[in-house]
Swiss-Prot record:
Protein name: Flagellar P-ring protein
Protein source organism: Aquifex aeolicus (strain VF5)
Quaternary structure annotation from Swiss-Prot or TrEMBL: The basal body constitutes a major portion of the flagellar organelle and consists of four rings (L,P,S, and M) mounted on a central rod.
Localization in the cell: Periplasm; Bacterial flagellum basal body
Domain of life where this protein originates: Bacteria
HAMAP family: FlgI
GN (gene name): flgI
Known role: Assembles around the rod to form the L-ring and probably protects the motor/basal body from shearing forces during rotation.
A UniProt-annotated Pfam family: FlgI
GO cellular component, one term: outer membrane-bounded periplasmic space
Family note: Belongs to the FlgI family.
Disulfide bonds: none
PANTHER family, sorted: FLAGELLAR P-RING PERIPLASMIC PROTEIN FLGI (PTHR30381), FLAGELLAR P-RING PROTEIN (PTHR30381:SF0)
InterPro entries in the record: Flag_FlgI
Amino acid sequence: MACKNIRYIVSLLILVSLTFGARIKDIATIEGNRYNYLIGYGLVVGLKGTGDGKATQFTVQSLANMLRRMGIPVDPRRITVKNVAAVMVTAKVPPYAKAGMRFDVEVSSIGDAKSLEGGTLLMTPLRGPDGKVYAIAQGQVIVGGYEARGRGAAQVKNVPTVGRIPNGAILEKDLPFSADFKEVNIYLDEPDFTTAKNVQDVINRAFGKNIAKAVDSATIRVKIPEGYSPVDFLAKVENLEVSTSSVAKVVIDGRSGIVLLGGNVSIEPVAVAVGSLVVEIKERPEVVQPPPLSPGETKVVPRTEVKVKEEKKRLVQIKGTTVSELVDALNSIGATPREIIQVLQAIKSAGALKAKLEVL
């Protein structure tokens, strides 16, 4: 099953690599057209005994301070916070957001709360990197997991200490932005000199003037021509199609065993030997009881079982130069995803893999 999955992934990437062009908006980001991040500290209340414990002093102090601001002085030592949890609230604000716009927020416990299920986030100011308050968040927390706990056992699904509040924040003031500019930068998501020059040439041809200039492998600086507003000009630019130059790359996720290979990966003839040595050691302590009424003592005697299994090496010679032939050759010798990762690393070290090897 693992081998089939790898073959399907390769086939998909081959189709992608044969695409003739892409819109500029799909491969690049226009200066200023990005998300902004906000963060805040708040309290979630109304939990069913799954909140922070007494050891979480900042939760106790935060609750006492909030009640004091409401005109209710309390002694922090008398506060029980099992129905309250201290949380960090994070949000991603869309570009060019205006005052009054609503957006989602994510709520994450920072204490020892067991679950945020059923809780309500109290009014929490959200600040930007400059320390200024841009939005206020409040609302019912929706949790994708749960925790069921008894005296002797507990069952947890997903992460109940993280939740979301759809449209839980409202922007109080516009984010800083100036619409009066004469030039703009376009940043490629994947820096490449060939693609940068292609973007430059496509824009210049579309407007009939040399208004675009590739500054480096990632940046194209564009002057807005006379007679165009920034919105009209950028709307036309971002929909222009440009041919892209993809880099031959093999991506390996060592934790999950997933291998992604592009269709333009070149491989020279190489012989691959795959084998493994499995050593299994089991410790089974055995309790030995003395005979009844004897002066002996109960002893624990170790029982060790050692098994060593060496699989025969499988040798295959890869003569093809395409990704599909490489995968078929590795599958033909019954290589597992882990072994395929080791093989690719060895082929790269031998200089037979003509592609960048990236290990996640």
